[in-house]
Regions:
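Nucleotide-activated sugar donor-binding and catalytic core shared by glycosyltransferases
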Residues: 1-374
Length: 374
């Protein structure tokens, strides 16, 4: 069968590539085309566009680059019609993928959505559009299945694909990691995860770097991603006493005592590595106020949303200050009770998420559903 798959950012590329790998095991004649990143390409997906040319963060950035976004959508629509896939698989990335879902449905293509947009947090009216244009939702958070069922959407909870990644990762060698990155053996590490998009890094990393001088006994290490130029990080870091590692986020977390993490998938990754964290988020003023007006949930981090309580501290917008970061990081490093409670909550979080196997289950659901509908 022919599969058209679209992911618009780094985490989506990772999850989509794992899904492709599992589909190939079950469908030996599978062919793939779509939009995504290096990991999808490595699995044999013929890319129309790389997500680097598509990823914009927040209302303002999207508005400024609206022409580019609309051009990408138009190119993608044409490519789907030319390719004539058996199914269109959309991975998160709602601003782009909702438009593709509507189009693909109208043209008679089967549409599967893997990794739900956070419509339960805002824009709940979008659920009605999902009900009309998506044949099957494959969700990765425990509470999402019940949410969609309330609206009559065909939905299956497949588990969280991050558990698949962690199962593959295993235990790294600390000494090798330290030597490879010229890190000291004696000083504990604090990880800085500023995000995977250029706009995020430019906004978040300068704020995170302000805390480094308050903790001279620790070594701060920035998690760089392959989709961004090394010069971007180096330009922001300047002469600060901070290290940069590239494409080694899991090894970094495995060897860290605490982390400052930009809100997103990385907050859950950090928790699954049992690293105490502070969640950070800052948008442009307009984007933030618009989001605040629209958002319907109490928390922004996946950890707190899944647990339905504040497990990790969220420093958002005006609260994301040097003083607050120093205060929270101090507690994570030196308050034993705070550390123990957070780690206990992390264990409960893992219990709620269940076991690995999301990619395999999602692939099975897709292939079986297509067989039934043929």
């Amino acid at each position: 069968m022919k599969y058209y798959i679209i992911a618009g950012e780094a985490s989506g590329d990772m999850h989509a590539s794992n899904l492709v790998a599992e589909i190939k095991k079950k469908d030996k004649k599978a062919e793939f085309r779509g939009c995504g990143g290096d990991l999808m390409k490595a699995q044999g997906v013929d890319l129309l566009k790389h997500y680097r040319t598509m990823a914009y963060m927040g209302f303002v950035e999207v508005a400024v680059n609206l022409r580019k976004v609309l051009d990408s959508i138009a190119q993608c629509k044409k490519d789907i019609v030319d390719y004539q896939p058996d199914v269109v698989i959309l991975v998160d990335y709602p601003g782009f993928n909702f438009r593709i879902a509507d189009f693909a449905h109208e043209k008679g293509f089967k549409v599967f959505y893997y990794i739900s947009p956070q419509v339960w947090a805002w824009k709940r009216r979008r659920v009605r559009k999902i009900q009309k244009s998506v044949d099957k939702m494959l969700v990765i958070l425990p509470f999402e299945e019940e949410f969609y069922k309330r609206y009559g959407v065909d939905v299956t909870y497949v588990g969280h694909p991050l558990l698949d990644e962690l199962a593959k990762f295993g235990n790294g060698n600390r000494s090798m990691f330290l030597r490879r990155n010229s890190l000291g053996e004696k000083r504990e590490i604090i990880a800085l995860l500023p995000g995977s998009r250029k706009q995020e890094v430019k906004r978040m990393l300068p704020v995170m770097l302000k805390v480094t001088s308050h903790f001279p006994e620790y070594q701060f290490v920035v998690a760089g991603v392959s989709s961004l130029e090394k010069s971007l990080y180096k330009g922001i870091m300047g002469k600060a006493d901070v290290f940069l590692v590239e494409n080694q986020t899991y090894e970094l977390l495995q060897n860290s005592s605490a982390a400052l993490v930009t809100s997103g998938t990385a907050t859950l990754e950090t928790a699954l590595f049992s690293v105490p964290e502070v969640v950070c988020y800052k948008a442009t003023g307009f984007s933030y106020h618009l989001a605040k007006w629209m958002i319907k949930v109490k928390f922004i981090s996946l950890v707190n949303l899944i647990m339905d309580k504040e497990v990790v501290k969220e420093l958002i917008q005006g609260d994301l200050t040097e003083d607050n970061l120093v205060k929270e990081l101090n507690q994570l490093l030196h308050d034993g009770n705070r550390q123990r409670q957070m780690l206990e909550d992390y264990e409960d979080l893992q219990d709620r998420l269940g076991n690995a196997g999301a990619s395999e289950k999602a692939a099975s659901v897709i292939i079986e559903s297509l067989k039934l509908k043929k």
